[in-house]
Structure formats: structure tokens, C-alpha cells
Amino acid sequence: MNQIKSIFTAIAMAVATISSVAIAQDAGASLSLTFTGLDAKEGAVMGVLFDSEDAYNGKGAPVRQIMITADKAELSTVLSGLKPGRYAIKSFHDLDGDHQMSSNPYGMPIEPFAFSNNATGNMGPAKWADAAFDVKPGANTHSITIK
């Protein structure tokens, strides 16, 4: 009888441990983003947050979209409820308010833009490997300079 009671006690303790871990994981992570380098106090900073290289490269959807009114030189927002993991951000300062990255006739961007980790691209967006950063459980911060 004591062995059965011990087994049920062990199972109950294991379930309680698993449940508390699941609750902690459900709490997720938050990401406090700061955008700096804005010269003009007009339009909005637009961005997208990706959780995979495929999505980042156009083979999937972003997990979050960001839009912050550009009313000062430094802007901040908090993205809550994220799963811990690896993420990357593409962003730009939408000066003309059309919600699109404006470009010249040759396809070169004419609005300021940036990637997470302040990564730079060569004739295109920064590579996932350069732009990706880790979001850990709890509070995280990341700063991007728009140029």
C-alpha cells in the first residue's frame, strides 16, 4: 500500500512540476524595442518581427507587425506574449505615410530603414544570420538605429 501511495505521490509531484513549467512557458517573453536615429518627426516607423529564416526571406508571415507614430527622435514599444526563441526585425521610417517602403526607379530605398542588430545588407536586406537575436523568457530589450 505504501508503494502505491509513493507512486501516486511521485506522479502528482511530476504533474505539478510539469504544470508549473507549462505555466511559466505560457507567460512567455516580452521585447522592449527602441528605434533611434529618426531625423524627421513625421510619418511612422513600420516594422515586422519574424521568428524564422524562411519567414524573414519571404516564405512565411511575420509574427508581429509594428507601427509607431514618429513624433520624436527616439521611439519605443513593447511586444508582449512572445515565445522565447530567435527573431529578426525589418523596419523603415514611413515618411510619406503610404505604409510602404518607397524606392527610386532603380528599386533603391529612399526612406530610412534598418534591421535588428543594426545589420546591413549588400544589394538587399541584411541576412537572417546577421539580423537574428535571441529572446529569452521574461523581459528583453533591443535597439535599432534607423538610417
Question: Where do the protein language model's features map onto the residues?
Answer:
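Bacterial N-terminal signal peptides that target proteins for export
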Residues: 1-11
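Bacterial N-terminal signal peptides
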Residues: 10-19
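Sec/Tat signal peptide C-region and signal peptidase I cleavage site
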Residues: 19-26
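A short, amphipathic beta-strand motif
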Residues: 31-37, 47, 144
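A short tyrosine-centered beta-strand micro-motif
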Residues: 87-91
